[in-house]
A protein has these predicted regions:
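Residues forming the flavin
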Residues: 6-153, 157-524
Length: 524
């Protein structure tokens, strides 16, 4: 079937199909998922009896469409061969923004040339395994840097709170096209898992190269690239420098400083920092699922949560909650301690962890600038607190830790519960050394969450410091109409590192939008 026939078939198919929403018990929903074509699925745990909301596809006669019906799930992408394309674009960073930008450029006949400072995903897995075994940090290949970006080994959640414009469903479809399971197309909180995402990222890379794009690993760009980009002669009507999509991720602090030196506009932005809290997953299941029996939990999966409160004019909230997950060392430089969370696809570890972070505005950290140096206040503050966590932890990436109730009540934990963080933990008074505008708000936030879910504030739980990379502390401002840097024409900052996204899906969407602007500029 050619593209025209496919598109006509899709149009006809979707014009005669409708959706019907069902409210089912977990067992009924499980059986329906095995038989029918599901469009959307979510869990309603507000009442004691869990309900699953399923949206099912039905035909023009009102009959439910069978799961295995030979009908298209979506229109597949149409990548062009760009081996000899005249139009090119440079992409810096092979995270979700960079990879989805590259795929979008292929769809428009533009040849992407991608530079990634880290390693390809298989070699990166080796470096991460060494890090988890206390065998050393590779500053260019870790949980932050390498093929797929930070999201590759931090859970693979495919949902976003972002309300930005764009085809978020198309992001899900591309993940599915490259190997994700069907449920990414309809789960309200879709999740791939850190064990499955690497093969999907690898498939994207192979597609880009097969169609004529380039990906260069272990390659850091230098300032000459940006110097040439901003040379006045290259702004005219003659031969111009290829456009650059800047998708560096939120941890490329050295690149931020290089950009500043080259006159690219950067500014501090609001972000969030705090700790990662870990409970027994069985306790979270009890609290969120109202003591449901294990056979019900087996049907719906381990419970997650999303918590938010306001303390002294700032948000305190959960971030990147990982049911059945692990806490991992997510730093990218020596003498710093950064933690994050991840879950494998089955989410079956005995632990539940989540970032618990406090909203930080630029004005919140300027008063303390004398403590951590000069520069971009928010960036310097972030680095300073990560170093403080290192000083209060132990050697070999051990993290400072405190039982949750001890933290809230202000005392040293004499011992610590079992924890999923492989490098190990050291008992520490986080309540004393965290800055007051973070620590005090966290303490009150945990009290608020205890009122909502009695039993949440328990010494069975442990907190680790610091959770500092939930979002970028810097923004690279861009023009809303063109998505180009306000200071540097032909430079397209995008994704988390530019301060315009937070997470895999919103970063991917931002990369798509940047690529579309380049295609528009090329009149393609």
């Amino acid at each position: 079937m050619d593209n025209v026939q496919f598109e006509q078939g899709c149009t006809l198919f979707f014009s005669i199909m409708e959706n019907v929403q069902l409210i089912l018990s977990p067992l009924e929903a499980h059986n329906a998922e095995q038989r029918y074509r599901v469009v959307k699925r979510s869990i309603d745990a507000r009442q004691r009896e869990l309900k699953v909301l399923l949206t099912i596809l039905v035909d023009e006669k009102g009959h439910k469409v069978e799961r295995e019906a030979p009908i298209p799930l979506y229109e597949p992408p149409h990548f062009q061969d760009v081996h000899h394309a005249e139009r090119t674009a440079i992409i810096i960073g092979a995270g979700p923004a960079g990879l989805f930008a590259a795929l979008t450029l292929l769809e428009h006949g533009i040849r992407p040339i991608v530079y990634e400072r880290g390693k390809e995903v298989s070699a990166r897995k080796v470096d991460i395994a060494r890090l988890n075994r206390n065998l050393g940090l590779n500053p260019e290949s870790n949980y932050c840097f390498g093929e797929g970006g930070a999201g590759t080994f931090s859970d693979g959640k495919l949902f976003s709170r972002s309300k930005k414009r764009g085809n978020m469903q198309r992001v899900m479809e591309l993940f599915h096209y490259f190997g994700a399971k069907d449920n990414v197309l309809y789960e309200a909180h879709a999740h791939i898992g850190s064990d499955k995402l690497p093969s999907i990222i690898r498939a994207m890379r192979e597609c880009i190269i097969a169609h004529g794009g380039e990906i260069h690993f272990e390659t850091c760009v230098d300032k000459s690239l940006f110097h040439n980009l901003s040379t006045p002669s290259l702004r005219g009507a003659g031969e111009s420098h290829p456009p650059i999509i800047l998708s560096i991720g939120h941890s490329a602090h050295d690149t931020y400083r290089m950009l500043l030196e080259e006159g690219v506009a950067l500014e501090p932005k609001g972000f969030a920092m705090g700790v990662r809290v870990e409970h027994p997953q069985s306790l979270i299941n009890q609290l969120m699922y109202h003591n449901q029996p294990q056979e019900v939990i087996d049907l719906v999966g381990n419970a997650s949560y999303s918590l938010v409160t306001q303390v002294q004019g700032r948000g305190v909230y959960s971030f990147c909650m990982c049911p059945g997950g692990h806490i991992v060392p997510a730093g990218s430089s020596a003498e710093s301690c950064v933690v994050n969370g991840m879950s494998a696809s089955h989410r079956n570890s005995p632990y539940a962890n989540s970032g618990m972070v406090v909203e930080i505005r630029p004005e919140d950290v300027r008063a303390e600038a004398y403590m951590y140096g000069s520069g971009i206040d928010t960036l310097e503050f972030q680095e300073w607190l990560e170093h403080e966590a290192f000083l209060h932890g132990g050697t070999d990436n051990q993290a400072p830790a405190q039982r949750l109730r001890d933290f809230v009540e202000g005392r040293l934990s004499r011992d610590l519960p079992a924890c999923s963080y492989l490098p190990g933990v050291v008992s520490s008074r986080l309540d004393e050394w965290l800055p007051a505008h973070i620590g005090l708000r966290l303490q009150q936030g945990f009290r608020d969450f205890e009122r909502k879910y009695p039993g949440f504030l328990t010494n069975e739980a442990v907190i680790l410091g610091v959770e500092s990379r939930s979002s970028s502390a810097v923004r690279i401002p861009r023009a809303p109409e063109t998505l180009q840097s306000v200071s540097t024409p032909n430079l397209y900052p995008c994704g988390e590192g530019a301060g315009y996204a937070g997470g895999i899906t919103s970063s991917a969407l931002d990369g798509i939008n940047a690529a579309l602007k380049i295609a528009e500029k090329y009149n393609l």
